[in-house]
């Protein structure tokens, strides 16, 4: 154990303390004796010496106990209400609604899985985030509501059983940033960031660095703030009666209908898209919707339910900030930095990489079909619907509604839509993002765009667009579809854009 000059996949971006300058691995203390020291009231242990574990093994009867992170009021026949902090025993764990029994009342029923956490574990701690990537940790900590010193501990992406500490900090050159520290494991089950001081558990580690920075970039202030999760959709409610929906506020009107904010059964806030009669076959729509509801990913707008009698209703999760193309033009959208704009692009690429992996096609990828949450999370909407539209103004390339400026040449000329034509559209979407919602090919009509594309023309680099981002756009606009990159590649480049293109990493302290 100790400095052995062997690298670790995460070491090049992790902040570490007391490390070898060559290999970045913790320096082995010269004295290997099992000395016990006390520092700021905490016991300090030698990280290179085995200590007998003091924690008794967990009882198998505790494995199915959970604790409520939020209160929940029952709203369905068969679900179970509970208060924050209440303990429950899980009887059946299936899907997003788990059958449970309250240890307080003895009653049984179904509970939303995302309102509870495993008892006698780290999961109920407000600073612990399970299954969170490094990039999503940065997004969470940089979201509104968090400040200098906000922090979280997450599971390591690359090393099972290990953890990482992520802390929001301020840098004079870069502004608000997130620093990451690897939390290393002791043989006896303890933890340390610096070998100068070790802790029997993560609670003690958090307590220590909350009192003093002690070598970290800043003192830990408070756990990363998150919103109360939305309860999962009740699984049996797919084709729902129109009367269960109350339309409250019209959010917008598109070519094929209107979008409303509303409530389902007076308790669940939803978005409702009402399609104009005759815009698509109800039978074809229901078949496609059954496929669409199987596509579930954090970067895709969740499809909840449908009304299949005309006018067709599509019920989805509600996104507070509306469409990306509109949000980019608001005062809040105009203030977004290039880093945040690139992060939004990375989120969209992540969602499209999932669609790519599932051998699905969007067909109408543009900023108008990306929705934005109040925490600036982006999700892809309306995937797959374009091919169902029975409107010649949309399906014919000469039609006024056909989105020529976003469509790949092979799709315009031959009607050939593939995931690679979606990649072309993504390149156009990147121009919308970097110009805060400007219409592509400014000053050109649709026929002029078609003529220019046939001559090999490509949109010029927009103002304030980094050269490296324009290079990525040009890759998306390769003439031969097979020469265009995958969405997974686009995601990887955009997630670490300045790192990937300039090789800049956070320096080791």
Curated annotation (Swiss-Prot):
Means of activity regulation: The relative activities of the inhibitory tyrosine-protein kinase CSK and the activating tyrosine-protein phosphatase PTPRC/CD45 determine the level of LCK activity. These interactions allow rapid and efficient activation of LCK in response to TCR stimulation.
Residue ranges of domain SH3 in the record: 61-121
Catalyses: L-tyrosyl-[protein] + ATP = O-phospho-L-tyrosyl-[protein] + ADP + H(+)
Q: Where is this region: Interactions with CD4 and CD8?
A: 2-72
**Entry-annotated residues carrying Phosphoserine:** 102, 162, 194
How does the record say this protein sits in the membrane?
Lipid-anchor
Q: What is this protein called?
A: Tyrosine-protein kinase Lck
User: From what organism does this protein derive?
Assistant: Aotus nancymaae (Ma's night monkey)
* Gene label: LCK
């Amino acid at each position: 154990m100790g400095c052995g000059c062997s690298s670790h996949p995460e070491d090049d971006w992790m902040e570490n303390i007391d490390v070898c300058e060559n290999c970045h691995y913790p320096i082995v203390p010269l004295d290997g004796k099992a000395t016990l020291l006390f520092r700021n009231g905490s016991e300090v242990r030698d990280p290179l010496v085995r200590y007998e574990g003091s924690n008794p093994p967990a009882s198998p009867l505790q494995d199915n106990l959970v604790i409520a992170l939020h209160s929940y009021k029952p709203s369905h026949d068969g679900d179970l209400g509970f208060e924050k902090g209440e303990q429950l025993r899980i009887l059946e764990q299936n899907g997003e609604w788990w059958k449970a029994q309250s240890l307080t009342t003895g009653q049984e029923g179904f509970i939303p899985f995302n309102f509870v956490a495993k008892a006698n574990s780290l999961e109920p701690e407000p600073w612990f985030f399970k299954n969170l990537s490094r990039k999503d940790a940065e997004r969470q900590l940089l979201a509104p509501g968090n400040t200098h010193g906000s922090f979280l501990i997450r599971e390591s992406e690359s090393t099972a059983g290990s953890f990482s500490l992520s802390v929001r900090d301020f840098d004079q050159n870069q502004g608000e940033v997130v620093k990451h520290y690897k939390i290393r494991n002791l043989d006896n089950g303890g933890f340390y960031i610096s070998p100068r001081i070790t802790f029997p558990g993560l609670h003690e580690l958090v307590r220590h660095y909350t009192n003093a920075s002690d070598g970290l970039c800043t003192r830990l202030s408070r756990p990363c703030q998150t919103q109360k999760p939305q309860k999962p959709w009740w699984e049996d409610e797919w084709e729902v009666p129109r009367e269960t929906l109350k339309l409250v506020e019209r959010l917008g009107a598109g070519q094929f209908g209107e979008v409303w904010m509303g409530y389902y059964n007076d308790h669940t806030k939803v978005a409702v898209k009402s399609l104009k009669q005759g815009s698509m076959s109800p039978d074809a729509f229901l078949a496609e919707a059954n496929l669409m509801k199987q596509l579930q990913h954090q970067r895709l707008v969740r499809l909840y339910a449908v009304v299949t009698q005309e006018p067709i209703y599509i019920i989805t999760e509600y996104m507070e900030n509306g469409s990306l193309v509109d949000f980019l033009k608001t005062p809040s959208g105009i203030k977004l930095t290039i880093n945040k704009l690139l992060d939004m692009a990375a989120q969209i690429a992540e969602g499209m990489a999932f669609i790519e992996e599932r051998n699905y096609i969007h067909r109408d990828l543009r900023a108008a079909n990306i929705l934005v949450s109040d925490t600036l999370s982006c999700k892809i909407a309306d995937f797959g619907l374009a091919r169902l539209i029975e409107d010649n103004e949309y399906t014919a390339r000469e039609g006024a509604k056909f989105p020529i400026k976003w469509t790949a040449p092979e799709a315009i000329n031959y009607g050939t839509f593939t995931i690679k034509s979606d990649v072309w559209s993504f390149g156009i979407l990147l121009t919308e993002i970097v110009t805060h919602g400007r219409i592509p090919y400014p000053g050109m009509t649709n026929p002029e765009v078609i003529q220019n594309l046939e001559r090999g023309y490509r949109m010029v680099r927009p103002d304030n667009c980094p050269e490296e981002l324009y290079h990525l756009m040009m890759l998306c606009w390769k003439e031969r579809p097979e020469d265009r990159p995958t969405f997974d590649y686009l995601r990887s480049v955009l997630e670490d854009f300045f790192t990937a293109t300039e090789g800049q990493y956070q320096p080791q302290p």
